[in-house]
UniProtKB/Swiss-Prot annotation:
Protein name: Uncharacterized protein L456
Species this chain originates from: Acanthamoeba polyphaga mimivirus
Amino acid sequence: MSVLVKRKMIETPISLSKFRYKRFCLPKIHPDILFETNDLPFFVKKLVYLLRKKYDMVNIDDNKLNTIYISTTINGDNFEVLLSFQKKLYINPDINFMAIDVTIKTKESMEFCIKKQCYDHIITIIEKITDKKVYANLPNFFYPKFNQLIEHIIDLNICKTFNNVEKWYFSKLVN
């Protein structure tokens, strides 16, 4: 009897339109930070320069493509932050947005406090560089029509914006 039931289930046609519709309507995951910039190489250089003023160590990692590494100590606790530029451009008819994902490595008890401080500082720096509003994955910071933006994959390598002398300089520079 169970064999017949299985066979009957296999032969039953499945309507894929329901699944496609649900998949199509899934909301996109909002990146940690979304911002508008016209000149990405200039933006990246300025961002690294301004981060160097605040944090103990800021480095461009050739091994982790499109990632800026930050390491510092706050109140005796060490933490690391990875700013990873997405290879997606988010487009609406008038504006192109770049996205950054933020990874913070610290003690669990300190994570929320460090994340809030780090986001605030990075958002302030990006606003200073671009002179435009920055949207973040925080309450009241979301881009209002994010799901209507069109995603466009781009060939991005922020390491190419720095020559070897600049990479060496940033890796050796001590605040």
